Amino acid sequence: LTLSKQTVPHFYLTVNCDLTRLSEIRERLNAHAPRDERKLPVWKLSINDFIIKAMASALRQVPDANVTWADEAIHKYHSCDVGVAVAVEGGLFTPVVRAAESKSLSQISMEMKDLAARARARKLLPSEYQGGTTTISNLGMFGIEQFTAIINPPQATILAVGAGLERFVPVKGQSVLRTQMTCALSCDHRAVDGALGAQLLAAFKTFIEEPALMLA
């Protein structure tokens, strides 16, 4: 990553995302999750599961951003393979949710739970953490409000996600308390220019703020 910071022409885009509707849908979906023989929910959706799905959906909507940069060329992909940074002792792994755009939220949730557990136990296969067309780094659980992340070559983007915080925002002329999270997209300018990066981040924001669109 040190080499990436020194050689990749990073630029950064930032947006605030309102979590009101996402939180409501998440609560309803979790309340109706199927139960196993012990009466425990088979899955429990996290905010991060929605973020993975939203990023994959955004890449599907803005396919020119679903790229990597290697050998002085842009490589385009049909599948949206989303890596997710998982902290482990002494470093991190980035297990990849393959074809996340085509998976349901519950599928992503169960798969990510398994991948994260095996990452922390250092039992991932190389094929489970190599590759990927983008990465998500979420430090919100540590109370970090905002940060920028270093691109993991040959990927051309990485999304840094901050904590969901209550803020007063203007809504129809009124100051309303809403939960928002700040997200920063780092882009490799050789493969994803400013306009393209802005389209991708705008699409991501739309899916986060209108999560029903991810269920269509």
Task: Give the residues covered by each predicted segment.
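C-terminal catalytic/motor cores of large multi-domain enzyme assemblies
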Residues: 1-216
